[in-house]
Amino acid sequence: MRINPTTSDPGVSALEKKNLGRIAQIIGPVLDVTFPPRKMPNIYNALVVKGRDTAGQQINVTCEVQQLLGNNRVRAVAMSATDGLMRGMEVIDTGAPLSVPVGGATLGRIFNVLGEPVDNLGPVDTRTTSPIHRSAPAFIQLDTKLSIFETGIKVVDLLAPYRRGGKIGLFGGAGVGKTVLIMELINNIAKAHGGVSVFGGVGERTREGNDLYMEMKESGVINEQNIAESKVALVYGQMNEPPGARMRVGLTALTMAEYFRDVNEQDVLLFIDNIFRFVQAGSEVSALLGRMPSAVGYQPTLSTEMGSLQERITSTKEGSITSIQAVYVPADDLTDPAPATTFAHLDATTVLSRGLAAKGIYPAVDPLDSTSTMLQPRIVGEEHYETAQRVKQTLQRYKELQDIIAILGLDELSEEDRLTVARARKIERFLSQPFFVAEVFTGSPGKYVGLSETIRGFKLILSGELDGLPEQAFYLVGNIDEATAKATNLEMESKLKQ
């Protein structure tokens, strides 16, 4: 198999007809193309079909070479609908892999898998482009330092801290706040780290992609007046697109993120929603290419495909890519090959709970289900580790006592257990926090809470110094000083009412 060299030819857009082939067969989104002898395109080369269909409509379809079949034939997967294509049509070999625009020109814009803008805001500066297929950074380039990526979100920083240059899985159903959490992270990294974000919508609903774009404009993450001031680039390959586009859109987003890391030497946040759809698209393509299915009907190359994407998401000596990936779990079965393969690559898992969302505690991160490999005393320090463990123990004890409380009531508990329950309820409320991106809806200003402030707050609650304060004072505040101030206000209000 000949793999294409990873250099990109910037002149490909001019499309010189140096190497022409013809369509021999069309099977849905898969094309077989015949080329002259000794002029076979390399694997991953982009092929372009231009022409008119029987109705006279203009056709412009880009495909990617996947297999060399022998007899001067290649099999390619289309990145857009193949309606109107016919046998015998001319196919141009571009001589290079798909290349997409990278750099500052991509910020504030929406792209498709081919790097074409789809937001009706005019053309994008394409002087700097990059091929979507690259090898992962070499060992010698990797940065092996373990450091915490502070998000300013209390529950995340304390109980399941993110690793700089790590990969985080975001597990949650519909309507529990995945999108709002993603937007807050984009906002916080822009403010605190001066970094940029890339959002890859892989096989998601078009409506959700549109909602995200509108919300980003409202919250100022995308600056409509001065687009260059925006902090995020969006790449979408929606559910209605062919499997080829859904399989490659993650790589397009990753390529844009890699440029910010390697050339601009920035810390980048890469969001992928949803990583399961990437696997699903790969499975469809695999079947279309005639490969034998593997376990549960997935592609036999599942681990390789996942690895080639995930291994490129890493920290180098130049900068870091920290990736947050939404993971759909089919039929809630974590042993399904798709989520199981994803788990192997994750450094932390953030689990969103419908129960907490129903209580009105946002972000609805489940403090007991969420995990992180970074929560070790040698990495985060003894104080952080001890505080996190004591918070978890208190919440776990509260969870165990809930059945007894439901049947017998609080009065039947021992003095010690009643104290634990009171503190756990304060902790639960203190884990909530007002978000900057939700200011429009809640009316309360967002809060960024530093890690040292977070630890100080929870230590005070656990020590019992704040046992006299009402639990309502801890709900939707930033640091612990705001909670004590809120308690004083609540006390004054109740006195005035009396």
From Swiss-Prot:
CDD domains for this protein: ATP-synt_F1_beta_C, ATP-synt_F1_beta_N, F1-ATPase_beta_CD
tRNA processing keyword on record: no
Protein residues bound to ATP: G172, G173, A174, G175, V176, G177, K178, T179
Record bears the keyword Nucleotide-binding: yes
A single GO BP: proton motive force-driven mitochondrial ATP synthesis
UniProt-listed Enzyme Commission number(s): 7.1.2.2
Chief localisation class: plastid
Enzyme class: translocase
GO MF assignments: ATP binding; ATP hydrolysis activity; proton-transporting ATP synthase activity, rotational mechanism
Signal peptide: none
Keywords: ATP synthesis, ATP-binding, CF(1), Chloroplast, Hydrogen ion transport, Ion transport, Membrane, Nucleotide-binding, Plastid, Thylakoid, Translocase, Transport
GO CC terms: chloroplast thylakoid membrane; mitochondrion; proton-transporting ATP synthase complex
Membrane-topology annotation of the record: Peripheral membrane protein
Compartments in which it is found: Plastid, Chloroplast thylakoid membrane
Gene3D superfamilies per record: 2.40.10.170, Bovine Mitochondrial F1-atpase, Atp Synthase Beta Chain, Chain D, domain 3 (1.10.1140.10), P-loop containing nucleotide triphosphate hydrolases (3.40.50.300)
Catalytic activity: ATP + H2O + 4 H(+)(in) = ADP + phosphate + 5 H(+)(out)
Biological function: Produces ATP from ADP in the presence of a proton gradient across the membrane. The catalytic sites are hosted primarily by the beta subunits.
Family the entry assigns: Belongs to the ATPase alpha/beta chains family.
Self-association state and partner proteins as the record states: F-type ATPases have 2 components, CF(1) - the catalytic core - and CF(0) - the membrane proton channel. CF(1) has five subunits: alpha(3), beta(3), gamma(1), delta(1), epsilon(1). CF(0) has four main subunits: a(1), b(1), b'(1) and c(9-12).
Protein name, UniProt field: ATP synthase subunit beta, chloroplastic
Organism whose genome encodes this protein: Castanea sativa
